[in-house]
Design a protein with these regions (language model features):
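Flexible glycan-contacting loops in extracellular carbohydrate-active proteins
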Residues: 189-217
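Carbohydrate-binding surfaces in secreted/extracellular proteins
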Residues: 93-95, 159-193
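Short, aromatic/His-centered strand-loop micro-motif at the edge of beta-sheets
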Residues: 141-166
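Short carbohydrate-recognition loop motifs
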Residues: 57-75
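Secretory/extracellular carbohydrate-interaction modules
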Residues: 72-139
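Beta-rich carbohydrate-recognition and catalytic domains
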Residues: 25, 29, 33, 40-54, ...
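C-terminal motif of bacterial Sec signal peptides marking the signal peptidase cleavage site
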Residues: 18-21
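Bacterial N-terminal signal peptides that target proteins for export
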Residues: 1-9
Length: 527
């Protein structure tokens, strides 16, 4: 079967507006059969089934669409679905459902049609199971059941027991967006996945499940106006022909300076005014501490000190140390000696009270592999004795898919809380991803977000990981700068991407860090 996805985006979570009535058609919307909330009867008083296709196990009664369990084997999936014609070129499809068991997966069927190649249907599905959403390409038959090919998946917060599950799919031209609607009211939704189809296969929309049972209590479809991305647009990766990884970005006087793993020995500095177009301004630091092993100059970051000088923390042959310069372009002069051995991925966080903290990954004597932190003296190159503590270790399953790794720390402060972001898994795994933890103190203790990771791979972008944050040119948007693999078949040379991030309110009162990415579709330039 020919795959039709040309470009793809996986994105962070968001909210839902109230479900609207089911309307189809172009132009002025006309109310059509509303399968989950209105019973339509024929002249003889019998309820009319509005669906043009009802798969095995699906029944429509009393205005409710039900998918009966098709298997008792919890390891088996027997996908089936039901759909009707969307009736509109661009639409918003909302589904409210309840799952029968922990093994149930169900959601929205879209771009569907009765298949000429199969005795059944084909299309796409956006589903929820437990605490994960999935995007599938579906083909199959009524004999074997629908055959799902996973295009992407993402962790989300598990629905509360008995809570209604709300999913949405929007079609806008050739672009589709899939939403898990669980945020607080008043927040505009961001999609979990965004992708482009050139062959829509069909115009059917409806419901789908994996054969373990679901009840669809509401389905509604309404036309929307097509809109395009306003202004100038970019597509990831923004570095294009430039090769770099582990980006640390500093904004100074309206310009962005990106320091990264790129030069064989030393560090290049890349400069931009808009975060999209970058130029290599050459080496900003040469050899440090007599260490000349090519390819082992990793993950630099730079901050501006109170006296106006610039301090770089860098990893050289698995030694962590500091270098100082008068300009963000360098030259950075290394301190007399490194600070720690068997340590990498340094990050300096400057708190509002002027205190500096160093975060890093260490496995030296007495240290378990993970992220550590300590307080710095005012010079930002000297560690305060007795302040070193472990803050993050690879204890969660998603951090152990490829090795046991938590690395690449970066700290944001929001509403008085400290958000420590980091990457999990080996950098060369497609599952290399970004998560975060929250604390009331810069040195912890930190509590990991229960729906990590918040940035993970898709069928188009592998290994989105080591990162830093900055703000857009006008300061109104939070931007994450991160690297990905060269392609889905090669890790190197890695390249740099940018996407939007934000803090979204939750019922707990602790805002959730969300990322609109990793994107592969056209996005508006940072404001």
């Amino acid at each position: 079967m020919k795959k039709t996805i040309l470009s793809f985006t996986a994105v962070s979570l968001l909210l839902f507006p109230a479900l609207s009535s089911c309307r189809t058609g172009s132009g002025s919307p006309t109310v059509q059969p509303e399968p989950a909330s209105a019973q339509e009867t024929a002249d003889g008083g019998e309820e009319v089934n509005p669906y043009t296709y009802l798969g095995p196990g699906y029944t429509f009664s009393d205005g409710v669409l039900t998918a009966a369990p098709a298997t008792e084997d919890k390891t088996e999936a027997r996908f089936s679905g039901a759909f009707l014609d969307a009736g509109a070129e661009n639409y918003r499809m909302d589904v409210t459902l309840a799952l029968d068991s922990l093994y149930s997966s169900a959601g929205v069927l879209f771009a569907a049609s009765e298949s000429t190649a199969y005795d059944g249907i084909e299309g796409y599905a956006f589903t929820l199971r437990d605490k994960r959403v999935y995007l599938y390409d579906l083909t199959g038959s009524s004999f074997s059941g629908l055959m799902p090919a996973e295009l992407a998946s993402k962790s989300v917060e598990r629905p509360k027991t008995g809570a209604e599950i709300r999913l949405r799919v929007e079609k806008n031209g050739n672009t589709y967006r899939c939403y898990y609607l669980d945020d607080a009211e008043g927040v505009d939704p961001w999609p979990e996945f965004e992708f482009v189809l050139t062959d829509h296969r069909g115009s059917g929309v409806g419901a789908v499940d994996n054969g373990h049972g679901a009840v669809f209590t509401s389905l509604s479809c309404e036309p929307i106006e097509e809109n395009t991305v306003p202004g100038k647009t970019y597509r990831n990766p923004v570095f294009r022909d430039l090769q770099a990884a582990d980006p640390g970005v500093l904004k100074v006087d309206g310009k962005y300076y990106c320091y990264s793993t790129s030069a064989p020995i030393g560090y290049y500095v890349y400069v931009s005014e808009d975060l999209v177009n970058w130029t290599n301004e050459g080496l900003c630091m040469n050899e440090a501490w007599g260490l000349s092993r090519s390819g082992f100059y990793w993950a630099p970051e730079v901050v501006r000190r109170a006296d106006g000088k610039f301090v770089m923390v860098c990893s050289v042959e698995e030694h962590l140390g500091f270098a100082v310069a008068d300009s963000p372009l360098g030259p950075f002069v290394p301190e007399t000696n490194w600070t720690f051995d068997k340590t990498i991925d340094g990050h300096i966080f400057l708190d509002e009270d002027g205190r500096g903290y160093l975060f890093y990954v260490s496995w030296r004597s007495g240290h378990d592999y993970g992220i550590w932190a300590c307080e710095l003296e005012d010079d930002l190159v000297t560690v305060k004795p007795g302040t070193e503590v472990p803050v993050i270790s690879p204890t969660d399953a998603w951090e152990q898919v490829s090795g046991r790794v938590t690395e690449g720390p970066f700290v944001l402060k929001h509403n008085g809380l400290y958000y420590l972001t980091y990457s999990g898994n080996g950098y060369d795994a497609k599952e290399y991803a970004v998560g975060y933890a929250v604390s009331e103190s810069p040195l912890g203790p930190y509590e990991k977000y229960k729906a990590n990771p918040i940035l993970s791979y898709t069928s188009k972008l592998y290994g989105p990981g080591h990162h830093s944050f900055t703000v857009s040119p006008d300061g109104s948007e939070l931007i994450i700068v991160y690297h990905t693999h060269a392609s889905t078949t090669a890790v190197h040379p890695r390249t740099i991407c940018i996407d939007r991030a934000r803090f979204a309110p939750t019922e707990s009162g602790v805002d959730r860090l969300e990322i609109f990415g990793p994107t592969h579709t056209a996005q508006e330039y940072p404001k």
